[in-house]
């Protein structure tokens, strides 16, 4: 088989390993593709080669290609399509290639969920599911779960003598709520659904607690923890050995060697016991006795060495003490009793989970909806059936798919879960040695365990498969990196060769795993990788842990801002592959990677202060926006006005506008009862004179509130929201505030959220509020509108997870001193795919609780998995850099941290000791000890001591390591020494002597006159309407300009709101109709009225505006000669916005400034028609003519011509500039009297 593989073509750019991955077949193949190794290109080439194979061509729809995201699937299709089109250019007559191009859109190139959906749609009749099902919204799913679970628990509470249930409640709930019990049920449900057979997994979980007739040695938890015992005892032994070496130095405390050797013997005894059984270790631990150190005269020995010896011995003793207290302070039988006692309670818990799953599935079925886990399980249900032994085997449908697919290719295989693996297994051949499964991925980049991805699947096959593929599957390593410079790759290798191993890290970073240089770059300057370790300021700016975090973010942000500015200003060069040359670095070339985003806003702020454009996709802040917060409180009050805090917030908001004094006055009217009750009581009585204004405000709001509450019971939620916006005027109000457009956009998003909610199976305001609460509980807050886009020349800030698959010339990895998130390990109960359920033993009667064996084992296992995941996250971060890698971390006490990192200094092997790697609490705890052993780390070497093996010390990589004093970063800019004296004089308000050498400087400053003063009295940006007014009056003067700077009143005062529309509002309504009326429909009263109603429904007009429209005047326009020309025109454009530059002297008739100054002019053209002989410009006017001018229209015409001449001339100029065609005619149309005025130059 191997001999038949095509040979690599002469001059091919594929490496040998890549070519092997393209052509190898005949068995299951696992490709371990390192970062930047071109795995996607290999995958596409393999598919193309299969399609165009001359001897055995495969149709593209006979391949199943599974990708991690929809975007990746689309990119794969595009690449395959482009490759096939290239083949077609060489073989234009190939019907086979043409067929493949036509089949491509139908090909199974998709995510696993899309494939599942395809299977379910095809075989829905094998399931109890409506074929018209829809995919549930995540929040809707959460609300359904809550509803089902509430019903189940309510039933359980109502059952008499439900002893075990109440035992469960007593153990796992508080006296305030049963939230913890609900969380346990939901967590067990979720975890079970990550397994092919959820019920079987749940049953095994209960079986593990059935210890009848078992000893502690029979428990999987004890077996695993014994491995941990060995690990900790080995760590203790290493400490004692190191202490012994130091004691035997010429100036070491030699008399203590005898005691240290006795310690080693003791630890040896414990280790031997750990290799035998739990009981053996327990018995040995009861007999632990440490000898007392011999007293010595410390002045006879090196004091530092003595301290180190004592410290190392104490560390060893602490390791043993920790084991004694956690694991061996109790007899083995007592651990077994815990399991016996907890077994019936756990059995009841699992029963509740099964009932919940059954009812939840039934409710989704009734509502015709499925979620993503359902897609996987339904697909698996179709593809599998149960054998006589009770095991899952391929169904007839699965066998059909096996016959259909010539090969199944899985991208990002390291992120597959157990259910997905089963689906893939059922549509591929049974035998790995003769299989047709091709898997590509990099387990070192598996960073989605929180989504239940299982890297162990990849690891298992990687260990099982061989490079030759003899007797099983084949593995191929793609280690060449075509992305990064040597300095980036060597720097990454140097760290990971020391920290990633099978025991701690889950995979050996061996020669096969190392990154190998595949890219060629020109020689560059300052390309060494860097570690910048910031020493936090001695006195924190803000007290407390949160304040310290804020300061760390600020320190790192300032350092990064300095480096970015310096690199940009100095013209630091990066390589441009498109031009094959070096070019100056741009802001877009930088990225700042963070483990999570809490620091991002502060980093953005610091960079902006330095004038650095920056972009971050902040998916937070929406619900914190003031306008959204206020509206949410309004809806909470509509739902339940008895809530004091939301009601007070609304009363205090601009909607009602009470001040603190008025709020206090209201509360004084009723010190008991809710705010709503007090408000209702206050409104029933007659107000005092001084309380009348308060009474009016509250009465207005109270009446609105009652109307809203009634409306909410009968109408849709989205209609309610828009009604509140309109009746309060709040939507218009926020539009007049700073960032008004964004605020209005935020309110529209809330309306859209309501529409989305109403598309689910839920209805009503109360449920909507719960819907939003669920979104916030999940941390799914949305980001507010963005000021910068992703394609602009900006520095980007993103999480390491978001950066996966991307690359950047210069990468900052920040926050390396932040502690790992271990909150999951602190939960009251723990779940694990292999070890099941673990929690404290709780006895509510005796009011005691203590740690159980299962909890200890699961916690230890989860910690080791977390450590391995964090290593992989760090690997992803470091491998994003193409040319320059800069690592930044902040520590509170650099000297103290250095002492801790010093443990690694003299370790003789590449891989650091397990206890150092497993004991890391942040990324710096891996990076710094590794760099401690490199020749370029002078700053670290000065603080440490000892020697490093030559192979490690002289490793071929370049590093710059620097410890930065945080005080220098937070200090203000230094004031020049020569100015100090002058500053002191100014502070003391001393006059400058007449004979002073500074006399001329002071005089020049006092007499200075701004050279562009004239320009400051005129706007740099004007609307056409404002320019028109400038020509008509003195509004262009300084005073008028200053008055214009005052914020305009966007809405009328409340006392005017019910007195009809103003002239301006009527004009706006008429213009809206003229903009949106459908010119293709008949212009009749009935049709126009119908269209106006449609505009109201679309919220283009309000009811009040619609009622004020004089439909007969609209019809009159279209009956006029000008209106008929509009209907007959070649093309009609309405409400055409424009912006153009205009000479200042054209815009301002009083301009006296420098010539050459330009003004930005903007406006909107009502209507523009194109006829055979040119363009005509039309402006609609609603001015009052009849009755205002005694001489009628003839008297008004010259006045109107003069009034609007400038405006239409500017419109014409703008159109001529943009269209490059002359405007033949400029017309004004006045609805009052149906008059047309033509404007002549």
Curated annotation (Swiss-Prot):
It holds the Pfam family UvrD-helicase. Its EC number is 3.1.-.-, 5.6.2.4. One of its GO terms (cellular component) is DNA helicase complex. ATP binds at residues 33-40. One of its GO terms (biological process) is double-strand break repair via homologous recombination. SUPFAM superfamilies: P-loop containing nucleoside triphosphate hydrolases, Restriction endonuclease-like. One of its GO terms (molecular function) is 3'-5' DNA helicase activity. Residues 12-485 form the UvrD-like helicase ATP-binding domain. The heterodimer acts as both an ATP-dependent DNA helicase and an ATP-dependent, dual-direction single-stranded exonuclease. Recognizes the chi site generating a DNA molecule suitable for the initiation of homologous recombination. The AddA nuclease domain is required for chi fragment generation; this subunit has the helicase and 3' -> 5' nuclease activities. This is ATP-dependent helicase/nuclease subunit A. The lineage of its organism: Bacteria, Bacillati, Bacillota, Bacilli, Bacillales.
């Amino acid at each position: 088989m191997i001999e038949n593989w095509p040979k690599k073509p002469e001059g091919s750019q594929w490496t040998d390993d890549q070519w092997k991955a393209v052509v190898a077949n005949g068995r299951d193949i696992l490709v371990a593709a390192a970062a930047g190794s071109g795995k996607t290109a290999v995958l596409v080439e393999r598919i193309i080669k299969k399609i165009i194979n001359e001897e055995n061509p495969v149709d593209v729809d006979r391949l199943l290609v599974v990708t991690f995201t929809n975007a990746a699937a689309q990119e794969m299709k595009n690449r395959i399509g482009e490759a096939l089109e290239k083949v077609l250019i060489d073989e234009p007559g190939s019907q086979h290639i043409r067929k493949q191009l036509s089949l491509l859109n139908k090909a199974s190139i998709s995510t696993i969920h899309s494939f599942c959906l395809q299977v379910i749609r095809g075989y829905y009749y094998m399931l109890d599911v409506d074929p018209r099902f829809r995919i549930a919204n995540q929040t809707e799913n959460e609300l359904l779960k809550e509803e089902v679970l509430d019903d189940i628990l309510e039933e359980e509470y109502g059952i008499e003598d439900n002893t075990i249930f109440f035992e469960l409640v007593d153990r796992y709930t508080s006296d305030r709520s049963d939230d913890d019990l609900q969380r346990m049920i939901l967590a067990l449900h979720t975890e079970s659904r990550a397994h092919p057979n959820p019920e079987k997994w749940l049953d095994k979980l209960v079986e593990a607690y059935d210890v009848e007739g078992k000893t502690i040695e029979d428990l999987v938890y004890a077996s695993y923890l014994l491995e941990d015992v060995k690990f900790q005892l080995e760590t203790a032994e290493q400490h004692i050995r190191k202490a012994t070496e130091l004691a035997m130095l010429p100036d070491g405390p030699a008399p203590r060697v005898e005691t240290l050797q006795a310690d080693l013997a003791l630890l040896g005894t414990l280790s031997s016991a750990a290799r035998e059984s739990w009981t053996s270790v327990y018995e040995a631990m009861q007999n632990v006795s440490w000898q007392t150190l011999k007293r010595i005269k410390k002045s006879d020995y090196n004091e530092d060495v003595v301290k180190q010896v004592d410290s190392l011995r104490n560390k060893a003793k602490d390791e043993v003490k920790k084991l004694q207290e956690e694991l061996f302070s109790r007899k083995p039988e007592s651990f077994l009793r815990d399991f016996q006692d907890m077994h019936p309670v756990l059995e009841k818990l699992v029963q509740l989970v099964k009932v919940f799953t059954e009812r939840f599935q039934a409710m989704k079925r009734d509502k015709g909806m499925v979620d993503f886990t359902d897609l996987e399980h339904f697909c698996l249900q179709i593809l599998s059936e149960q054998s006589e032994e009770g095991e899952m085997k391929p169904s007839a449908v699965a066998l059909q798919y096996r016959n259909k697919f010539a090969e199944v290719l899985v991208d990002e295989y390291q992120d597959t879960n157990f259910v997905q693996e089963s689906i893939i297994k059922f549509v591929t051949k049974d035998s790995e040695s003769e299989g047709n499964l091709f898997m590509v991925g990099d387990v070192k980049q598996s960073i989605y365990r929180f989504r239940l991805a299982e890297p162990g699947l990849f690891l298992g096959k990687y260990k099982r498969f061989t490079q030759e593929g003899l007797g099983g599957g084949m593995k191929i390593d793609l280690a060449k990196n075509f992305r990064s410079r040597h300095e980036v790759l060597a720097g990454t290798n140097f760290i990971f060769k020391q920290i990633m191993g099978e025991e701690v890290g889950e995979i050996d970073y061996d020669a096969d795993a190392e990154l190998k240089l595949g890219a060629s770059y020109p020689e560059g300057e300052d390309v060494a990788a860097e570690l910048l370790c910031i020493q936090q300021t001695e006195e924190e700016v803000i007290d407390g842990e949160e304040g310290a975090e804020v300061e760390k973010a600020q320190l790192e942000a300032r350092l990064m801002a300095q480096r970015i500015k310096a690199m940009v200003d100095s013209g630091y060069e990066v390589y441009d592959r498109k031009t094959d040359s070096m070019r100056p670095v741009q802001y877009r070339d930088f990225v700042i990677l963070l483990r999570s985003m809490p620091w991002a806003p502060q980093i953005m702020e610091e960079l902006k202060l330095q004038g650095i454009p920056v972009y971050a996709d902040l998916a937070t802040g929406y619900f914190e926006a003031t306008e959204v917060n206020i509206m949410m409180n309004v809806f909470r009050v509509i739902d339940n006005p008895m809530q004091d805090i939301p009601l007070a917030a609304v009363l205090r908001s601009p909607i009602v506008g009470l001040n603190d004094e008025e709020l206090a006055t209201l509360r004084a009217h009723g010190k008991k009862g809710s705010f709503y009750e007090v408000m209702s009581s206050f409104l029933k009585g007659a107000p005092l004179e001084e309380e009348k204004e308060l009474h009016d405000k509250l009465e207005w709001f109270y009446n609105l509130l009652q109307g809203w509450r009634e409306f909410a019971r009968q109408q849709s939620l989205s209609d309610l929201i828009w009604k509140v916006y309109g009746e309060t005027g709040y939507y218009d109000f926020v539009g007049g505030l700073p960032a008004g457009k964004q605020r209005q956009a935020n309110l529209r998003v809330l309306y859209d959220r309501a529409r989305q909610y109403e598309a689910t199976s839920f209805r009503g305001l109360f449920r909507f509020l719960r819907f939003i609460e669920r979104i916030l509980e999940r941390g799914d807050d949305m980001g507010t509108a963005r000021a910068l886009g992703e394609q602009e020349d900006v520095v980007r800030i993103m999480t390491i997870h978001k950066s996966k698959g991307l690359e950047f010339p210069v990468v900052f990895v920040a926050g390396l001193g932040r502690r790992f998130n271990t909150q999951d390990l602190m939960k009251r109960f723990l779940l694990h795919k292999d070890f099941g359920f673990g929690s404290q033993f709780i006895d509510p009667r005796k009011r005691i609780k203590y740690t159980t064996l299962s909890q200890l084992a699961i916690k230890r296992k989860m910690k080791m998995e977390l450590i391995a995941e964090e290593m992989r996250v760090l690997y992803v971060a470091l491998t994003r850099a193409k040319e320059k890698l800069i690592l930044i971390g902040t520590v509170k006490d650099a000297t103290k941290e250095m002492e801790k990192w010093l443990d690694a200094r003299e370790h003789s092997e590449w891989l650091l000791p397990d206890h150092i790697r497993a004991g890391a609490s942040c990324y710096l705890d891996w990076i710094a000890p590794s760099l401690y052993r490199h020749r370029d780390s002078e700053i670290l070497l000065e603080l440490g001591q000892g020697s490093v093996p030559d192979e490690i010390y002289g490793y071929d990589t370049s590093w710059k390591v620097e410890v930065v004093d945080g005080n220098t970063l937070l200090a203000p800019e230094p004031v020049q020494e020569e100015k100090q004296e002058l500053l002191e004089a100014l502070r003391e308000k001393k006059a400058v002597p007449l004979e002073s050498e500074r006399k001329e400087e002071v005089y020049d400053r006092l007499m200075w006159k701004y050279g562009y003063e004239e320009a400051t009295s005129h706007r740099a940006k004007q609307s056409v309407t404002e320019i028109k007014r400038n020509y008509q009056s003195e509004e262009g003067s300084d005073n008028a300009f200053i008055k214009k700077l005052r914020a305009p009143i966007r809405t009328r005062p409340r006392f005017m709101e019910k007195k009809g529309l103003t002239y301006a509002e009527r004009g706006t309504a008429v213009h809206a109709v003229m903009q949106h009326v459908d010119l293709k429909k008949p212009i009749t009263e009935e049709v126009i009225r119908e269209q106006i109603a449609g505009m109201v429904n679309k919220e283009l007009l309000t009811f009040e505006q619609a009622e004020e429209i004089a439909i007969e005047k609209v019809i009159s326009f279209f009956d006029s000669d000008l209106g008929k020309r509009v209907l007959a025109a070649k093309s009609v454009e309405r409400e055409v916005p424009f912006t153009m530059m205009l000479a200042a002297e054209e815009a301002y008739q009083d301009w006296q400034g420098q010539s050459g100054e330009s003004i930005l002019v903007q406006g909107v053209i009502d209507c523009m028609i194109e006829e055979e002989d040119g363009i005509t410009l039309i402006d609609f006017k609603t001015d009052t003519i009849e009755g205002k001018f005694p001489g009628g229209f003839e008297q008004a015409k010259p006045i109107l011509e003069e009034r609007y001449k400038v405006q239409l001339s500017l419109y014409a100029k703008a159109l001529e500039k943009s269209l490059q065609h002359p405007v033949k005619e400029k017309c004004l149309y006045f609805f009052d009297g149906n008059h047309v005025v033509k404007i002549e130059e």
